[in-house]
Amino acid sequence: MTVLANHSFAKMNGIGNEIVIVDLRNTDSQLSAAEARAIAAPGGVPYDQLMVLQKPRMPGTTAFVRIYNNDGSEAGACGNGMRCVAKRVFGESGAQAATFETRAGLLNCWQGPSPDLYTVDMGTPKFGWQDIPLAEEFRDTRYIELQIGPIDAPVLHSPSVVSMGNPHAIFWVDDIEAYDLERLGPLLENHPIFPERANITLAHVVDRNHIRMRTWERGAGLTLACGSAACATAVAAARLKRTDRTVEMSLPGGDLTIEWRESDDHVLMTGAAVLEYEGLFDPDLFAALA
């Protein structure tokens, strides 16, 4: 029987990004992709990302955090999920700062400017075509040659691409609501140019300090919020000189403040995290896996 049967969990959200947190730091158990899918299945606990806390592997870190999408695939980064992890850990320990290890590297988190806000240092963005990664070489990733629709009248074209520990493509549009992202998102996510698939964002620059955006999240689908996409979009806009290095990002689920810090190129994300409820996993969710 899986260790998850009757195991506790916390259902949270980061400005609408649905997060489930499972703490396995007191065991040596590993969570499988099949178990991650079972949790999100009908009758389970719906989520966009599942944050699994494991024993720390490096001195000075609080936990190794594995991040799953609801299709069972693993993600390197999830900014909204890390804010939820920070809220959970800080509430239990009384700490106001912690360092977590993820597949994307070390992430520092701390209490934000008010009790309901948390800041995550998402590290440095990457722009090289091999780092994102892309299937072919592009010397300048501020825009790449990619379009969907007729050649003479493409529906979307020329995205900016950025890695924030996971691949992002940002399409600049005048109206983020004018496109059927549920139809276009999976086509672009799985485009051959993205060998590891990609998160797809539609973004509109309102002014130098404000961007509106919607995201189709790799492995999760249309989402109310994607923190790493907000970071990637803010960085991409600043690279194009369309915004300053600190911007307010308006997502369907709420707002984030993103700062691309000039001193070290780290990207800082500040936003809310909310606990919805706690519970125990129903063993029947995992019966088919026995």
Curated annotation (Swiss-Prot):
Site (Could be important to modulate the pK values of the two catalytic cysteine residues): H168, E217
Chain coiled-coil ranges: none
Function recorded in the entry: Catalyzes the stereoinversion of LL-2,6-diaminopimelate (L,L-DAP) to meso-diaminopimelate (meso-DAP), a precursor of L-lysine and an essential component of the bacterial peptidoglycan.
Active site, per annotation: C78 (proton donor), C226 (proton acceptor)
Family: Belongs to the diaminopimelate epimerase family.
Subcellular location field: Cytoplasm
Catalytic activity field: (2S,6S)-2,6-diaminopimelate = meso-2,6-diaminopimelate
Record-linked Gene3D superfamilies: Diaminopimelate Epimerase, Chain A, domain 1
E.C. number: 5.1.1.7
Pathway: Amino-acid biosynthesis; L-lysine biosynthesis via DAP pathway; DL-2,6-diaminopimelate from LL-2,6-diaminopimelate: step 1/1
Protein name per the record: Diaminopimelate epimerase
Transmembrane portions of the chain: none
PROSITE patterns for the chain: DAP_EPIMERASE
GO terms, biological process: lysine biosynthetic process via diaminopimelate
InterPro entries, sorted: DAP_epimerase_AS, DAP_epimerase_DapF
Gene Ontology cellular component list: cytosol
Assembly and interaction partners: Homodimer.
Highest taxon above the source species: Bacteria
Keywords: Amino-acid biosynthesis, Cytoplasm, Isomerase, Lysine biosynthesis
Keyword Plastid: no
